[in-house]
């Protein structure tokens, strides 16, 4: 290339560069920047620095788009400043009103929605804030338990010296409608129903209407008229006491099988056609069937249906009215009852809780259960509904009984578990298990009693939900 061509080429490049600069017109106006489409929210809290009446900060516990948070009892949730992190350029609103982190006071007295909109306006994400007053330490234990075991709703109550000292509702009683759990929310009790049955039996006993050592079946038995005298060998030796202690002798349990037969038909089949595996009174083998028979005894002896007798006697004595027999169908759920959520492919509405009412079909609130506990705990502030001798009989551990492995067994009384080495502070207690249900209540040796009710149950084999729930209750009781 000759020198003239080089000069022409250089001149062309120089001219082209000037044209580009001229078209840019200062540069910033036409350079396109990429705006963020992120719409996340994190680090939600109520900081002491942002709220003058708070002595300590409260941090939210997040599960997906759901955030649980507790502030002390004396903090007004109607006007509290939240702190949170959102992407640069994104905006947040509550009820359509803009909210700035660490600046805007908001009302969190009810379920609150925070909507985060991305910088470019193309994405928005909603977060649900469930704020409540309470003890952040106690509630933190409950939140951790809920997240670990995927439980939508939990209710907890604690009493000390026969007075309720703490109660709280956590999460949703009904997820779809976002109905919140309260201490008045009704939950299925599952096997905690057995204590309702036990108390009804104790009431009949104290009224002189029932002998604990009376035979149940066969000639002269309490239920002779209902089930005749043609019973299997030794069935006529089964007593009320044996049924209360799970030592009736049956190895099979027909209560939670899928069948259209009535309770009377199932009882008749068991006593007339199913041989006992163990001698009555000799061997502990947990039996829902036995407690359903006790429910039948209550109705026959009292002349009233099971729920009516409980309400007119045991519950009336305790001044409570919010305990009922539950319903099988979701559509028949009471207005203040939670919905139950199965896990692991389990159907939370697959069990016949109406048939099994005396063994596992009752519903109640934590608030009512703590009131009831005050009448059966040997306390001095609230008069017990039974004589000390009756309570002693009900709470005395098994004697001269073995388990199905042939080892001495003393961990059950009459309708109550007792003497568990892992829970030395608990005098008596009982839990409950059904699909969609996990429950526990405990009477402690120092009269700090407690109850936990859940509307779901995890079947994850990598963790023990019951052990976690029991330890959580024990830890909460230890704070009082």
Task: Give the positions of each predicted feature.
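Alpha-helical scaffold elements that line and support the substrate/ligand-binding pocket
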Residues: 158, 162-163, 188-211, 243, ...
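Beta-rich interaction/scaffold domains
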Residues: 25-136
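Bacterial N-terminal signal peptides that target proteins for export
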Residues: 2-12
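Catalytic loop of the DD-peptidase/beta-lactamase superfamily, centered on the K-T-G motif
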Residues: 25-30, 134-168, 311, 316, ...
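Catalytic-site signature segments of enzymes, centered on catalytic residues
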Residues: 231, 252-331, 356-370
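Short active-site loop at a secondary-structure junction
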Residues: 149-155, 168, 177-242, 278-287, ...
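C-terminal motif of bacterial Sec signal peptides marking the signal peptidase cleavage site
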Residues: 20-22
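Active-site helix/loop module of the DD-peptidase/beta-lactamase fold
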Residues: 188-191, 204-250, 300-340
């Amino acid at each position: 290339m000759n020198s003239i061509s080089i000069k022409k080429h250089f001149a062309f490049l120089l001219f082209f560069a000037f044209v580009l600069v001229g078209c840019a017109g200062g540069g910033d106006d036409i350079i396109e920047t990429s705006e963020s489409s992120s719409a996340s929210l994190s680090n939600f809290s109520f900081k002491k620095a942002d709220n003058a009446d708070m002595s300590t900060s409260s941090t939210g516990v997040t599960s997906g788009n759901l955030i649980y948070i507790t502030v002390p009892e004396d903090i007004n949730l109607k006007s509290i400043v939240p702190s949170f992190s959102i992407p640069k350029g994104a905006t947040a609103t509550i009820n359509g009103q803009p909210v700035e982190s660490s600046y805007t006071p908001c009302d969190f007295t009810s379920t609150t929605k925070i909507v985060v909109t991305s910088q470019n306006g193309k994405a928005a994400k909603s977060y649900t804030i469930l704020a409540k007053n309470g003890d952040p330490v106690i509630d933190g234990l409950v939140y951790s338990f809920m997240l670990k075991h995927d439980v939508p709703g939990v209710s907890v109550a604690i009493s000390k010296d026969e007075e309720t000292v703490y109660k709280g509702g956590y999460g949703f009683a009904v997820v779809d409608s976002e109905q919140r759990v309260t201490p008045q929310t009704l939950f299925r009790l599952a096997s905690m129903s057995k204590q309702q049955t036990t108390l009804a039996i104790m009431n009949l006993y104290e009224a002189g209407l029932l002998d604990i050592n009376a035979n149940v079946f066969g000639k002269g038995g309490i239920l002779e008229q209902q089930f005749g005298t043609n019973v299997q060998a030794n069935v006529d030796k089964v007593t009320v006491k044996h049924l209360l202690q799970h030592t009736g002798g049956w190895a099979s349990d027909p209560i939670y099988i899928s069948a259209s037969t009535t309770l009377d038909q199932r009882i008749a089949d068991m006593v007339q056609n199913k041989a006992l595996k163990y001698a009555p009174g000799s061997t502990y083998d947990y039996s829902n069937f036995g407690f359903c028979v006790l429910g039948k005894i209550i109705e026959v002896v009292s002349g009233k249906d099971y729920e009516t007798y409980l309400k007119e006697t045991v519950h009336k004595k305790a001044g409570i009215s919010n305990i009922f027999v539950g319903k099988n169908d979701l559509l028949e759920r009471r207005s203040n009852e939670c919905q139950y959520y199965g896990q692991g492919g389990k159907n939370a509405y697959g069990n016949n809780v109406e048939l099994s009412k005396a063994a596992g079909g009752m519903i109640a609130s934590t608030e009512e259960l703590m009131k009831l506990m005050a009448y059966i705990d040997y306390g001095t502030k609230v008069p017990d509904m039974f004589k000390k001798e009756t309570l002693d009989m009900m709470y005395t551990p098994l004697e001269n009984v073995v388990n199905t492995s042939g080892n001495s067994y003393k961990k059950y009384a009459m309708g109550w578990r007792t003497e568990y080495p892992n829970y030395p502070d608990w005098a008596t207690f009982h839990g409950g298990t059904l699909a969609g249900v996990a429950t526990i209540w405990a009477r402690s040796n120092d009269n700090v009693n407690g109850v936990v009710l859940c509307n779901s149950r995890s079947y994850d084999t990598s963790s023990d939900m019951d052990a976690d729930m029991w330890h959580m209750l024990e830890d909460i009781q230890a704070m009082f």
